[in-house]
């Protein structure tokens, strides 16, 4: 990584993007007929799959049931071939548990859980290929899967990462940019209200720079929303045609 120029004098990144430019996003909904909701997304070379079941009765001990809202259960996993490491991660390892917790916190802020008291909503996300922005891809795939399941949400929840290189805020970091070790943040946003569902930083950043990086992530999340909204509308149109409406 030594000597790698992350941002050229002309303002181009390693992969040819401008500072605030997203990687190419492709997504599909309804990829698994057996699930209540499902979606697949590619953000650059990062690929994630999300499956949703519920709302359904609480599984296991009924003491876990919440009298005023649904219990949101999120589980994260990554395929053993998803990174260059080829390292087998045990199910329930620390990274997977942390990601599952982050996803749960994110979707508890977005799903209208009070409409389904004493029930459970399961969100399973698997990363098939990791090349930067893993959390964001998981959130965006899960949002589409929750919508596919017909579960009411306050708003879309859209996520993107951002970093700071050579005095410039970069949106939607690739693996190369993440591996360089500069300050990075991950943001999950409810775009209509501007409410932040989750914000995480992994390094210190001066207050003057933080606002710029946060705005880069927020604008990127709004751009993601535009793309996801298009995917949802296309899915609804295709479903209507199949149903003969």
UniProtKB/Swiss-Prot annotation:
Keywords: Acetylation, Cytoplasm, Exosome, Nucleus, RNA-binding, rRNA processing
Modification type N-acetylalanine: residues: 2
Keyword DNA damage among record annotations: no
Record-linked CDD domains: RNase_PH_RRP41
Chief location category: cytoplasm
InterPro entries in UniProt: ExoRNase_PH_dom1 (IPR001247), ExoRNase_PH_dom2 (IPR015847), ExoRNase_PH_dom2_sf (IPR036345), PNPase/RNase_PH_dom_sf (IPR027408), Ribosomal_Su5_D2-typ_SF (IPR020568), RNase_PH (IPR050080)
Compartments, record wording: Cytoplasm; Nucleus, Nucleolus; Nucleus; Nucleus, Nucleoplasm
The organism's place on the tree of life at top rank: Eukaryota
Record-stated family: Belongs to the RNase PH family.
Function comment: Non-catalytic component of the RNA exosome complex which has 3'->5' exoribonuclease activity and participates in a multitude of cellular RNA processing and degradation events. In the nucleus, the RNA exosome complex is involved in proper maturation of stable RNA species such as rRNA, snRNA and snoRNA, in the elimination of RNA processing by-products and non-coding 'pervasive' transcripts, such as antisense RNA species and promoter-upstream transcripts (PROMPTs), and of mRNAs with processing defects, thereby limiting or excluding their export to the cytoplasm.
Protein name (database record): Exosome complex component RRP41
Gene name of the encoded protein: EXOSC4
